[in-house]
Amino acid sequence: MSLRLVSPIKAFADGIVAVAIAVVLMFGLANTPRAVAADERLQFTATTLSGAPFDGASLQGKPAVLWFWTPWCPFCNAEAPSLSQVAAANPAVTFVGIATRADVGAMQSFVSKYNLNFTNLNDADGVIWARYNVPWQPAFVFYRADGTSTFVNNPTAAMSQDELSGRVAALTS
């Protein structure tokens, strides 16, 4: 029976290799992209005011603003010009208006009046509003790319352009 002794140099080299492998694995795994948290509320389909299909899941993993509005709401009318400007100034953020409680003609007139050059959906039956538990208009959901969101609903005042701009800027910072 022969006894084999490991030299101190070989043991040291093996230790260095083990540490190097651990460091590579640790930093390699730390930099692995994380999956975006799925928001079940985005699992809806709808029709835009121009009649095109829309899939809510297309917003997953992107900064986005959902704006719940009606054409007869005074606060929605007050917010619309700001939304038009803030959306135009933030092309990295997807804006989607979700209109209800009116006929399509009134919705389309509202979009035209305020030059809302972003997607607006016809939610005449209120299904999307119900998914988000929106009790009244106007309301917003601000989505960050990681899937987290903030719901804002103030039935007593329109959101100021400064507040809207700040909330939108935070989605991409």
Swiss-Prot record:
Q: Which UniProt keywords apply?
A: Disulfide bond, Redox-active center, Secreted, Signal
Q: Which Pfam families match?
A: AhpC-TSA (PF00578)
Q: Which GO terms describe its biological process?
A: cell redox homeostasis
KW Secreted (keyword) present: yes
Where is this protein found? Secreted
Which family does this protein fall into?
A: Belongs to the thioredoxin family.
Instruction: Relate the protein's function as given in its record.
Output: Disulfide oxidoreductase that catalyzes the oxidation of reduced, unfolded secreted proteins to form disulfide bonds. Despite a weak homology to thioredoxin this cannot serve as a substrate for thioredoxin reductase.
InterPro entries for the chain: AhpC/TSA, Thioredoxin-like_sf, Thioredoxin_domain, Thioredoxin_ResA/DsbE_sf
GO CC annotations on file? extracellular region
All disulfide bonds of the chain are C73-C76
- Organism of origin is Mycobacterium tuberculosis (strain ATCC 25618 / H37Rv)
Name listed for the protein in its UniProt record: Soluble secreted antigen MPT53
In terms of PANTHER family, this protein maps to: THIOL:DISULFIDE INTERCHANGE PROTEIN DSBE, THIOREDOXIN-LIKE PROTEIN HI_1115
- The signal peptide annotation in the UniProt record is 1-38
Supply one GO molecular-function term: oxidoreductase activity
